[in-house]
Amino acid sequence: MEDTDRTISRLWRSFKTVKEMVRDRGYYITQEEIDMSLAEFRSRICDSMNVPQRKLMCFQANPTAESLEKFPDLGSLWVEFCDEASVGIKTMRNFCIHISEKNFSTGIFIYQSSITPSANKLIPTVSPASIETFQEGDLVVNITHHDLVPKHIKLARDEKKELLERYRLKESQLPRIQREDPVGRYLGLKRGEVVKIIRRSETSGRYASYRICL
C-alpha cells in the first residue's frame, strides 16, 4: 500500500510539472489544472483498486493567442503518459501514428523506466512534427523552480534578429546551449533558437545573457 501511495504521489507531482512545462511553452493551461490536489488526482486517475491509470493523464494543449502572436508556427501539442514500464516498437509506433494523423506539431511521451533502441529509432519518422521523451522520475521536481536555475526566456524570430543586429553578431558568436540541457529540454528548444537568461547579480541587480540552441 505504501508503495502504491508513493507511486501515486510521485505521479501527481510529475503531472503537475508537465502541466507547468506546457504552460511555460506558451500553451493554455489553467491554474486550476496545475493546482489539482493529490486527493482529486487520485480520484480521477486511479481505478477501484487504487491503481493509477496513466492513459487517463493524457491531454491536448493549444497555444494561447499571445503565444501565437510571438511564435506563429506554434501548433497543438499532445502529452501521453505510458502505462508500460518498458516501451517497445508497437507502443511507440502507435504514438507516432497518433501524432501524425491528428496533425500535432509536438508529441511529449512520458515513460516509466525505459524505451528500447528500436522504438527510439521511430521518433524522427514523424517529421515535421517533433517527439520528445521524458522519464517520469525526471519530472517529479520542476527544475526551473530551483533557486540556482536562472530564468530562461525563448526569443521570437524577430527578437533574435534584433539581438544579432544590435550587437553585430553572427549566430556562431553566441554562447551555446545544448538541446539536451535540462532547461533546454523543458522549453522544447530547437536548433537555432535563442534563449535569454536572466541572472541575479549582487552588484547590478539583474543581468541578461543569451545562448543559441545547437
Curated annotation (Swiss-Prot):
Q: Which ranges of the sequence are coiled-coil?
A: none
> Which Gene3D superfamilies does this UniProt record tie to the protein?
RNA polymerase, Rpb5, N-terminal domain, RPB5-like RNA polymerase subunit
> Does Nucleus count among this protein's keywords?
yes
Q: Which UniProt keywords apply?
A: Nucleus, Transcription
Q: What is its main location?
A: nucleus
Query: Subunit structure, briefly?
Result: Component of the RNA polymerase I (Pol I), RNA polymerase II (Pol II) and RNA polymerase III (Pol III) complexes consisting of at least 14, 12 and 17 subunits, respectively.
What is the name listed in the Swiss-Prot or TrEMBL entry for this protein? DNA-directed RNA polymerases I, II, and III subunit RPABC1
